[in-house]
């Protein structure tokens, strides 16, 4: 099983779309989101392409492929619109992990 790991979308449809294109291109089976999905936080500027409603739509379209851990900018109200669980502070994954010496820039495995 191939996992893609991402975090800190902060409501940016621009970066969410880039992430989902990489998810498709890399043919990953699951997407592990490490929080901060919709809100940008009170101390941060609005990210490029800030459109949380669009992010909701994009992520709900692949909800069965997402495992999410709550970030510091995620709130209970976010769970009302996202169709996959986000409120757990932790999750247990029982998958084998392999390590490689290839760097992301050598394989093109980056956004």
Locate predicted features.
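Core catalytic region of metal-dependent phosphoesterases/phosphodiesterases
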Residues: 2-96
């Amino acid at each position: 099983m191939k996992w893609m790991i991402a975090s800190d979308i902060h409501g940016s449809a621009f970066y969410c779309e880039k992430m989902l294109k990489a998810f498709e291109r890399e043919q990953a089976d699951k997407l592990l989101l490490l929080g901060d999905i919709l809100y940008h936080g009170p101390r941060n500027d609005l990210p490029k392409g800030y459109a949380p409603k669009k992010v909701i739509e994009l992520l709900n379209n692949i909800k069965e492929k997402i495992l999410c851990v709550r970030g510091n900018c995620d709130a209970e109200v976010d769970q009302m619109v996202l169709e996959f669980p986000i409120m757990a502070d932790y999750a247990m994954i029982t998958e084998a992990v392999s390590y490689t010496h290839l760097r992301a820039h050598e394989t093109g495995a980056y956004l």
